[in-house]
From Swiss-Prot:
GO terms for cellular component: endosome; Golgi apparatus; Golgi medial cisterna; Golgi membrane; plasma membrane; trans-Golgi network. Residues 1-6 are cytoplasmic. The keyword Chloroplast does not apply. InterPro entries: Prob_Methyltransferase (IPR053223), Put_SAM_MeTrfase (IPR004159), SAM-dependent_MTases_sf (IPR029063). Glycans are attached at residue 247. Its main location: Golgi. The chain crosses the membrane at residues 7-29. It comes from the Eukaryota. Its EC number is 2.1.1.-. It is an enzyme of class 2 (transferase). This is Probable methyltransferase At1g29790.
Length: 378
């Protein structure tokens, strides 16, 4: 098809060039004829030679014929898209087709049709497939919120408050108990004791630390009340648990990366928000007093994505609210040239700004702890 189109275009080009040459020849002949006869007769009108008329007529007819058979690009493209759409619709699961008529589906979902079709390929009114990994893949790729399904989510068989492990479906994860997670990944916060959470945010060991007591005192001195907060990438909800003991409600955004983070947050009587960092936070404008960004917010996030992220945090923060960057990790040169200017665009007051070198740094990596206050009014 591509070769035929190229040959057709070449033939059209040759025909057009030939037409132009004959036209120039005709004009030249006509001009000479006028110059030779102008003295003898001012009113005589030259006639076009018959052979030129026949050649021009033949070429124009050929051009019209070729143009008529030349496929229109816009029509061809739309037809192709319609064919693809039709093909996709014919292979899409029935439940996906039904839901798509009821509610819009995130545009990013259509970029991963295989994953989306696998997710929506289930038996209605029965148990949902065991597809936690698939859910995480779709959400991380921007397919959020996911389409709703008419199936029953799987739950543990014998949940018990006295046995935390019984409240988790461990088949999705490499570890099969909280003890395993605590032993293998001691820094991930799966020791769910309140004492552990309190001690984690009460000690002051370096300039990078910001104990909760100091945070509350700063807010009190500024006549600012802390009632509602969000911990972005808050893991198992340790910060939210410590703030709950201070009568401050904190929502925790988290993803289940090979561990039951959301379940751990919920078992503490806290609210887990299962949302990715690249998506708009499901919170109304200007209602949050505090946003904390933990280990999940670091240099691995693309710069433009991070800029949109910071301005989304600004959207939900009330005037006078606080943004706490807790150990933001990057190279020192990037902090100075990229991230500090980006943060500066928010126009926040620097209540605390502490930078320290990473202990085992080999490439100039540093940590930043910053407490920033949003202007009361814009």
């Amino acid at each position: 098809m591509a070769g035929f189109t190229m040959s057709l275009n070449l033939l059209l080009l040759v025909a057009m060039v030939a037409t132009n040459i004959l036209s120039l020849y005709h004009l030249s002949s006509t001009t000479n004829f006028f110059q030779s006869t102008v003295k003898s007769s001012q009113s005589s009108v030259p006639t076009v030679p018959d052979h030129l008329l026949r050649q021009l007529h033949t070429i124009r007819a050929a051009i019209n014929h070729l143009t008529t058979h030349q496929p229109d690009k816009s029509t061809s493209t739309s037809t192709s898209r319609a064919a693809v759409s039709s093909s996709s619709s014919s292979t899409a699961p029935k439940e996906l087709l039904i839901y798509s008529k009821l509610s819009p589906i995130a545009s990013a979902c259509h970029n991963y049709p295989d994953l989306l079709h696998e997710y929506m390929n289930y038996t209605p009114f029965s148990l949902c497939p065991s597809d936690t990994d698939l859910v995480e893949k779709l959400i991380l790729r921007g397919c959020h919120p996911l389409p709703r399904r008419r199936c029953f989510s799987r739950t543990p068989r014998n949940p018990s408050d006295s046995k935390p492990e019984s409240n988790v479906l461990w088949s999705y994860y490499s570890c099969k108990s909280f003890d395993c997670l605590i032993t293998k990944f001691s820094d991930l916060g799966f020791d769910l004791s309140l004492e552990k959470s309190k001690s984690q945010f009460s000690a002051y060991k370096s300039e990078l630390d910001l104990p909760i007591s100091q945070l509350l005192q700063i807010a009190k001195s500024a006549n600012s009340v802390l009632r509602l907060g969000i911990d972005v990438g808050g893991g198992t909800g340790s910060f939210a648990a410590a703030m709950k003991a201070r009568n401050v409600t904190v929502l925790t955004t988290t993803m289940n990366f090979n561990a039951p983070y959301s379940e751990a947050v919920a078992m503490r009587g806290l609210v887990p928000l299962h949302v990715p960092l690249q998506q708009r936070l499901p919170v109304f404008d200007g209602v949050v007093d505090l946003v904390r960004c933990g280990r999940a917010v670091n240099r691995w996030i693309p710069v433009t994505v991070m800029e949109f992220f910071f301005f989304d945090l600004d959207r939900i923060l009330r005037g006078g609210g606080y943004l706490w960057l807790d150990r933001f990790f990057s190279k020192k040169v990037d902090l100075e040239n990229v991230y500090a200017p980006m943060i500066g665009k928010l126009g926040y007051k620097k209540v605390k700004w502490a930078v320290a070198n990473k202990a085992d740094s080999k490439h100039g990596e540093v940590f930043l702890t910053a407490l920033l206050q949003k202007p009361v009014a814009r």
